[in-house]
UniProtKB/Swiss-Prot annotation:
Family as reported in the entry's similarity comment: Belongs to the transposase IS21/IS408/IS1162 family.
Domain called HTH IS21-type: residue spans: 3-65
Pfam families, A to Z: Mu-transpos_C_2
Alphabetized InterPro entries for the sequence: HTH_IS21_transposase_type, Integrase_cat-core, IstA-like_C
Name recorded for this polypeptide: Transposase
Molecular function GO labels: DNA binding
Length: 508
């Protein structure tokens, strides 16, 4: 192409003769004339089609490439493996020819995808109260001066586009149920359909087409709220594009820069408030008015929510001889009467409830620590061990559950343990909380300490007077006039001197 441009420039601009051009280029006159008549077109050469050794295997290789394109990156065969498989079938060509064929096949497939229906979508329209969309995302926040990775639940009404964002530490079933409880509370009702991707908190197994093995507890929640769950095709986020867009918007609105809060509860309260503020100032986009305006129109079409779903996840645990149950590397105490017995552990987002024989026996604040660099925590309730120390009062001195006794009990313990039998007496006083109100027992102990008589008998006396409603201060008596003393008696100790006289001895 460059030589053609030079020949044309010499002839048409510099007016050189064909003879001179032939001398400079070494080409024949006929070739020069042909180039000049060709105009600006590039010279073409007839290249005969040459058969390739890969031609008999082209269909098989195309089928292999199509199959491999549907596999994950780690499961795909390499070009060298495909070349080896072709060689085993009788292919005698080079690896480079196979690699070139694969490149051409990928280019053709890419062009086909760009010119077909894939990548084009149909706009969706929803009726009021028809559906909501749900999705998870990951973001960061500083909770209690520690940078924490959060699992953020996004719920969005498809008609009004009202949305709610709520943060959790884990992406588990109990968190999913809690997110729905709060979303329906904020929305003021329940739509008829829920649109999800194939998240592991809802789907146990993805089948062919629309077949799904839905989690039993998730279906229990959907049945409780009377909505129909609908799951998108795998890798088809555009089927719930509203909430996918909401994930991007929420990251810019709420998590950039990284928010800082003393607790997760404070963060969620702030997120709920900010979401409602965005409802009021964000235009709907397709209808006149803000998101808040359209949401007010949609609320009557939502089914009113009755009571929140009891969204716990239940495990069967065996209580250890030290009256503990284990969950997520942490340990929680249970009453000593359940030691070495199976119990039901109901896990909520913020608490752990222990049930036995159909009755709730205790409850603890849930501890979630995803750092494996720190050991698990043990959460005690000293009341659970009172039955043990009643049999073994000496365990009260160094018992780990009794480190967190109320300050009043700690002060009394320091006094009683200095006396013989103080262990038993202290245990008897602590055991009073099993039959009486704990606050009343604490008040009785506090009054006994302030009176300077911190004994079991005095504490019992004060406690019974508190329980019976009797006054703890002696009453003032208003005696009648007839009983008033006119002459108060005066002490005269000299009269005892008569007893000191010498005794007269009598003869026997």
């Amino acid at each position: 192409m460059a030589l053609l441009s030079v020949i044309r420039r010499w002839h048409f601009r510099e007016h050189l003769s064909i003879r001179e051009i032939c001398r400079r280029t070494g080409l024949s006159r006929n070739t020069i004339r042909k180039y000049l008549r060709a105009g600006g077109a590039e010279p073409k050469f007839n290249v005969p089609e040459r058969p390739s050794k890969l031609d008999p295997f082209a269909d098989r290789l195309s089928a292999w490439l199509k199959t491999e394109s549907k596999k994950s990156r780690k499961q795909k065969r390499t070009m060298k493996q495909l070349h080896s498989d072709l060689v085993s079938l009788g292919y005698e060509g080079s690896y480079n020819r196979v690699a070139a064929f694969a490149r051409e096949w990928r280019d053709d497939r890419q062009r086909e995808l760009q010119t077909t229906g894939r990548g084009t979508f149909v706009p969706l329209a929803f009726e009021p109260g028809e559906a909501f969309q749900f999705d998870w995302s990951e973001d960061w926040a500083i909770i209690g001066n520690e940078r924490t990775k959060l699992q953020v639940a996004h719920t969005k009404l498809s008609y009004s586009r009202a949305f709610i964002v709520r943060a959790y530490l884990l992406q588990t079933h109990e968190m999913l149920f809690d997110a729905h409880n709060h979303a329906f509370r904020v929305f003021g009702g329940i739509p008829g359909r829920g649109i999800y991707d194939n998240m592991r908190t809802a789907i146990d197994k993805v089948g062919r087409g629309k077949e799904r093995d839905v989690n039993v507890r998730f279906m229990a929640m959907a049945s409780h709220y009377v909505f129909e769950p609908e799951f998108c095709n795998p890798a088809s986020g555009w089927e719930k594009g509203q909430v996918e867009k909401n994930v991007q918007d929420a990251r810019h609105r709420f998590f950039q820069p990284v928010p800082r809060f003393p607790s997760l509860e404070a963060l969620n309260d702030w997120l709920e408030q900010r979401c409602k503020e965005f409802w009021a100032k964000t235009p709907h986009g397709q209808m006149r008015g803000t998101i808040a305006d359209i949401w007010v129109e949609e609320v009557p079409a939502l089914m009113p929510a009755s009571r929140p779903f009891d969204g716990f996840v239940e495990y069967t645990k065996r209580v250890t001889p030290t009256c503990l149950v284990h969950l997520e590397r942490n340990r929680y105490s249970v009453p000593a009467s359940l030691a070495n017995r199976p119990v039901s552990l109901r896990v909520y987002p913020d608490r752990v409830v222990v049930a036995a024989e159909g009755q709730i026996v205790c409850e603890h604040r849930r501890v979630i620590d995803r750092s494996h660099d720190r050991p698990g925590q043990t959460i005690y309730d000293w009341r659970h061990y009172l039955a043990v120390v009643q049999r073994k009062p000496g365990a009260l001195r160094n018992g780990a559950p009794f480190v967190e006794l109320p300050d009043v009990f700690r002060t009394l313990q320091q006094y009683l343990l200095k006396k013989p039998g103080g262990d038993r007496e202290m245990v008897d006083i602590l055991a009073l909380v099993l039959q009486h109100d704990e606050q009343a027992v604490l008040s009785a102990v506090d009054m006994a300490l302030r009176s300077g008589v911190p004994t079991k008998t005095h504490v019992l006396n004060l406690l019974h007077r508190l329980v019976d409603g009797k006054s703890l201060t002696p009453p003032t008596l208003d005696a009648p006039q007839a009983l008033t003393l006119t002459n108060e008696p005066k002490a005269n100790v000299e009269r005892y001197d008569t007893l000191r006289k010498t005794e007269v001895r009598h003869a026997s």
